[in-house]
């Protein structure tokens, strides 16, 4: 399991030092696309932060595939600081809690899907991002949007 890898833990430790300086007094964060490379690392980093810091951040981790979440995050599925949301972004956000910060990493970035269905792929990514922005606007949250080079 990646979480138990010594090198991975060392990397989390180094990134943790940087994270302490940028989190400030934030108390809650929603991360979308948590089964992707960047999103899964960010969730592990926030869990590491909560385990090693004297303050706790409430983490909301969102992805559409419950099975992938359970496989990737089996080490934290029962962690009280992490709340998993199983949702596709083709619908409005189903998180009633207020979050201060949203890191939006979810998108349909599969080249094969884009090649077959370019318009619907683009529209789905736009619609998902719009739902994130609406949710943020209604709750006064800040949004950080990042993606791979494969987003359309």
Give the location of each predicted region.
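Conserved glycine-rich Rossmann-like NAD(P)H-binding loop of the short-chain dehydrogenase/reductase
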Residues: 51-69
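Non-catalytic terminal and boundary segments that flank Rossmann-like NAD(P)-dependent oxidoreductase
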Residues: 1-30
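Conserved Rossmann-fold NAD(P)-dependent oxidoreductase catalytic core, especially the SDR/UDP-sugar
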Residues: 104, 130-152
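NAD(P)H-binding glycine-rich loop region in Rossmannoid oxidoreductase-like domains
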Residues: 86-124, 135
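N-terminal Rossmann NAD(P)H-binding glycine-rich loop of SDR-like oxidoreductase domains
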Residues: 28-48
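Adenine-nucleotide cofactor-binding loop residues
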Residues: 67, 90, 127
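Short, conserved SAM-binding/catalytic segment
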Residues: 67-81
């Amino acid at each position: 399991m990646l979480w138990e890898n010594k090198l991975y833990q060392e990397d989390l430790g180094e990134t943790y030092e940087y994270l302490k300086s940028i989190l400030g007094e934030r108390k809650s964060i929603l991360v979308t696309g948590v089964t992707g490379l960047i999103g899964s690392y960010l969730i592990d980093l926030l869990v590491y932060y909560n385990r090693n810091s004297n303050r706790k951040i409430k983490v909301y981790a969102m992805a559409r595939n419950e099975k992938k979440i359970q496989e990737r995050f089996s080490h934290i599925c029962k962690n009280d600081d992490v709340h998993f949301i199983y949702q596709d972004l083709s619908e409005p956000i189903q998180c009633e809690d207020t979050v201060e910060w949203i890191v939006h990493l979810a998108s349909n970035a599969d080249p094969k899907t884009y090649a077959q269905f370019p318009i619907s792929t683009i529209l789905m990514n736009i619609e998902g991002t719009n739902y994130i922005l609406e949710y943020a606007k209604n709750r006064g949250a800040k949004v950080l949007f990042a993606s791979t080079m494969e987003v359309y």
